[in-house]
């Protein structure tokens, strides 16, 4: 972990946005299983109920990102848990993930709009963007997880 990352994590802890937490392999595998189920369900409804597919892909991304944090002894602890989770996951994963994390953060904002503003519906283009982002993110993070903890049960690539 580089010094900038450590400084960010220290700052987030002081602000009450990040806490230390250990998680065992069973818990991490349960999160990964849930992410896999969300992705499977999203693929089933994709093209039929775009908003539902979008949210399922999003939930899977969030669960995978939480695994990354927990593997590093961290968890979000604030009113912006999703934002914090993606921010910290991107920092842990490194600079080659930053473009994907920026895309996920934009999609997170769309998801919030959709959730809190019924006029902000999610359409086919947003769902496809979420699918391709989820696919790319999982395929990259899967490799990271394989190297980091061989006890994890990793589902197939999207």
Predicted segment positions?
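Terminal alpha-helical segments
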Residues: 1-158
């Amino acid at each position: 972990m580089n010094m900038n990352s450590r400084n960010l994590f220290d700052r987030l802890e002081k602000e009450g946005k990040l806490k230390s937490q250990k998680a065992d392999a069973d818990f991490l595998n349960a999160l990964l299983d849930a992410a896999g189920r969300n992705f499977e369900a999203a693929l089933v409804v994709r093209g039929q109920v775009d908003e539902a597919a979008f949210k399922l892909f999003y939930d899977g991304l969030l669960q995978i990102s939480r695994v990354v944090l927990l593997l590093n002894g961290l968890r979000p602890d604030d009113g912006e848990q999703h934002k914090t989770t993606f921010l910290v996951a991107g920092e842990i994963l490194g600079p080659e993930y930053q473009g994907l994390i920026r895309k996920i953060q934009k999609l997170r904002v769309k998801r919030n709009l959709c959730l809190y503003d019924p006029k902000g519906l999610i359409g086919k283009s947003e769902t496809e963007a979420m699918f391709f982002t989820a696919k790319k993110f999982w395929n990259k993070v899967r490799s990271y997880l394989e190297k980091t903890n061989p006890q994890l049960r990793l589902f197939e690539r999207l």
